[in-house]
Each structure stands twice: as C-alpha cells, then as structure tokens.
C-alpha cells in the first residue's frame, strides 16, 4: 500500500504513460491506415486484436527485462559499424516501414479509387493483423527500453504500458474515422511514416538524428494541415449556405467548362498515343448545345414565369366583336394552332380554341362566343414558380395557360414549347424572326429577348442582378431610368448596348458589343 502512496511513483507513472502514448502515436497512425484496407465491418475487430496482441507482446517483453537490456549489446562489430539485435530489429522495421509507406503513397498519388466500396479489393484480415503486430514489435522496442531507463519497478512499467495501450485503443477508432473522412491527412500521415522509417534506419546504422528535429517537422506539418482543414471547413460551411440546386448547377457547369487555350495551343504531333488522347478529349468535350441545355435545366427552377412566357404584346387573340370574315381571315393568316378568344380586349378572356375547330364552327354558323366558352382558360399568377408550372401544363393537355398579375391583367401565356425554349433555346414560329442574330463583332437582339437566354449566349452572369427584369428591354429601361432613345448607348459592365430601334413605349432592337 505504501508503494502507491509514494508521490514519486505516481509522477513516474504519469510521465511514463505520456511517453508511451507519444512513442505510440506513429504506431497508431499506421494502424489507422492499415485498418482502412479491410471491409468496414472488420476494421474495429482488426484494430482491437492487433493492439491487444501488441499489449501482450509488450508485457512479455517487460517480463524479460534482463533479456531486453542485452539486446543493445553488439553482435556484429568491425572497424566500420557495429550492430546489435535491437539495431537489426530497427533496421528491418524501418525498411519495412519505408516500403509500406512508399507503396501506400504511390496508390494515393496515382489517385486510385479508395471510395468505391462495391468494387474495392479488400486485404486479408489476418494479413493486416500480422502487419499491425509486426510493426508494433518494432515500435514496442523503443517504448520498452524507454520504460526500463525511466522506472525501476516492473509493476509501474506494466501499469503504464497497459494504460497507454488502453488510451491508444480508445483513440484508434476516432483517428481512423478522422483519416477516412479527411483524405489529405492520409498523405500527411504516410509522410510521417516515411520520416519515422528513415529515422529508424538511421538509428540502426548509428547515424543519430535528434528526436527534436523529427518532432518539430511533424509538429509543423500538423500545424499546416490544421490550417488546411480549417480553410476546407470554412469553405464547406460557406458552400452549405448556397441552395442545393445552385451548388449542383455550379459543380456540373464547372465540368463543362473547357479552357480555350487547350484548343488554340494544341500542338500537332506524330506521337500515336498523344493523337489518341487528343481525339478522346475532343469526343468527351461538351458541345455548346449540350452546355446550353444542361444550364437551362439547372437554372429553370430559379427563373421567373415572366422570363419564360410569351409576352402580352406577342399574343395573337380572337376578338368576338370582329366580323366572322375578319376572324376567318385571322385564323387562316396566323400560323398558330391555339387562340385565346376574348370579348373586346385581351383581359376579357372567354376561352381557348383550336383554329381548325373554330373554322369548322364558323362554317356551321355556330356563335364564336358560345363555342369558345365551352373551353375555359387556365389562368395562373405571375408569381408561380416554373416547377409547379409543369404540373399545370400537364393538366392543360396540350393547351396553353394564361399568366395574370394580381390585378387580373393578362401578362402573357405559356405553352409547353415556351418551357422547351427556356431549356434548349429559341424555336421561332413561321411569322417570327430570331430574337438574337450573330453579326461579325456584335449581336443584334430584340428588346423582348429573355435575359436568361441572352446571358447563356454571351457566356456571362453580369446581366441578371434582380428578378424585376425579364427581358433585355426591361433591363435597359431599368438601367437608364427611362425609355432610351434610338442611337443611345448604355454600358453595363463589359458590354455596350446600342439602341437601334425604339418606339414611344418599348425597345425593339439593340446591338450588343463586348468592350
């Protein structure tokens, strides 16, 4: 009992436990890396068995203290070097550590797939356990000799080794999980093992490297990695604040971006391998149409209804107050299949009719108002989001839906074709001209052109800063503060917008140049 009341005993025990843990950190790192080679359900078992056998081996070595001490006596000696059993063990262990760490580093640097658990070839369970025990034998030797040099009581040494091993067991799973989550730490740990293996070989050959240098290098590397992990954590935190859809869009768009210099600076070569690689890159590159469509799909949910719809000014509608002959001529001259039928003005919608069916009804002298009222319009608010709009269009069964504001004023209409154009680009009707015409060093653009489509064509994100503007004309009016006159030029970031044609109430045509 007096044995445990001695403060010096407790101080020696505490110091020895700390030293055993410090000396066991390199072993712990190697255990964590080896455990990853096993299936997830076997990792804990291998770790426990490996460290458990290592504990038994350390206790056995402690019980043979007198024999362990003699391991430092030279067995090979000449004028150039001398080697003891301890030196041989350190040499073999150091070389094995260098070999194993180099193989692991090669796999990491070659970027082999460590995440595909379905097709991953796992190592044998007992092969990993044996490696853990063998490496622990090398690391144990230093720990046991340190214990013998510090404390005289065998019981204290055994207690310290047991406590240190228990702490290592508790920390091993957390360390393994941390390394599995943070893959950059694996490369850092393997670099540590290379340093440790080199120091073991140097020590065995009597080239003494101060431990302080080794620990200082490891400590500094850990500090740099801590900064790296903090930076990565902050980056992920900032990314998590973005909507999931935006993050997915940015990630996919980054995959589609191709460096223009890769095409401009491509060097012609007769090397067959380089030709094959070049052609494969050509085939794997996203085409402009594919980029446009993928971007359209990913950004669809974030757009407003106004940016998708056919605006009020472009709606062809049938006025019941016109004569039958006027209505017949309108139906025959306009290349549309569906028409809203209204009484006097567009806001007084009676119904939606097909041109062919209405012509047949007129020939049968059926009243236009009565015929149109059989198919009432589907009206949606201009605040509806595009995702819910798709469900409404499905219920419309091939017809279109009318977009109205909170005051009941018709803003436009949307057909399934409008949604397709928002994704894949413009499909002009027979009576339409393209919204955007590419000139030599500029673009000739209609004022009613959708801003999202224009942004994609110009490959910029500088135009849409708020949701109030859906068209180019609306953007320029908002930028100017009033309706600009023909001949005026408005500059927005790196683009110049020259007003080619404008009326008293809208912008018709704009020429865009990049500064």
Curated annotation (Swiss-Prot):
The record's section on InterPro entries has: CBS_dom (IPR000644), CBS_dom_sf (IPR046342), FAD-bd_PCMH-like_sf (IPR036318), FAD-bd_PCMH_sub2 (IPR016169), Integral_membrane_TerC (IPR005496), Ion_transp-like_CBS (IPR044751), Transptr-assoc_dom (IPR005170)
- SMART domains, from UniProt? CorC_HlyC (SM01091)
Pfam families to which the protein is assigned, alphabetical: CorC_HlyC (PF03471), TerC (PF03741)
Q: Which GO terms describe its molecular function?
A: flavin adenine dinucleotide binding
Q: Name one GO cellular component term.
A: plasma membrane
Q: Which residues cross the membrane?
A: 14-34, 49-69, 79-99, 125-145, 150-170, 185-205, 207-227
**Where is it localised?**
Cell membrane
Record keywords = CBS domain, Cell membrane, Membrane, Repeat, Transmembrane, Transmembrane helix
Topology relative to the lipid bilayer, per the entry, is: Multi-pass membrane protein
Query: Main localisation, per the record?
Result: membrane
Q: Which residues form a coiled coil?
A: none
Where does the source fall among the domains of life?
A: Bacteria
Output the Gene3D superfamilies linked to this UniProt entry: 3.30.465.10, CBS-domain
CBS domain boundaries: 309-368, 372-432
Give the protein family.
Belongs to the UPF0053 family.
Q: What is this protein called?
A: UPF0053 protein BUsg_314
This protein's species is Buchnera aphidicola subsp. Schizaphis graminum (strain Sg)
